[in-house]
Amino acid sequence: MKQGEVVVLLISDAGTPGIGGPDAELLCMDENIPVTPIPGPCGVVSALSASGLATNEYTFVGFLPRHGPSRKERLMASANEARTQIFYVLPHKFSQSLKEFSSLFGVSRYIWHILIV
């Protein structure tokens, strides 16, 4: 490390830093600070590989908006998606989200879930 050089270390106890969490906004792009990722456990890849669903094409949706029209719009767009989709859902919203997914996606869609607490 050179004198005056900026080094940022981001450690997450909730998966890979910068993937689907609030820490994504902390990344260093705006300040032109190089980022060197060190791969670790990732909920997206774990869910995809354990699901048994198609892995050749998938969409990572992440967390949906909490309320209102933007949430419904995003879910309606997802209802028309043919690829495997991965959503992050908070544990206390899990049952409500499954009901919502079932009502919008229909009974012909397979909804597979992993609950990570």
Which functions belong to the PLM regions below?
Residues 1-3, 77:
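Short amphipathic alpha-helix with an adjacent loop that forms part of the alpha/beta core around
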Residues 3-8, 84, 88-117:
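A contiguous loop/helix-start segment that scaffolds small-molecule binding in enzyme catalytic cores
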Residues 4-14, 19-22:
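Ordered, amphipathic secondary-structure segments that act as subunit-interaction surfaces
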Residues 12, 35-40, 87, 113:
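General beta-strand structural signal in soluble alpha/beta enzymes
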Residues 15-16, 43, 93:
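Alpha-helix capping/helix-boundary segments
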Residues 21, 25-81:
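Class I SAM-dependent methyltransferase SAM-binding "motif I" and its flanking Rossmann-like core
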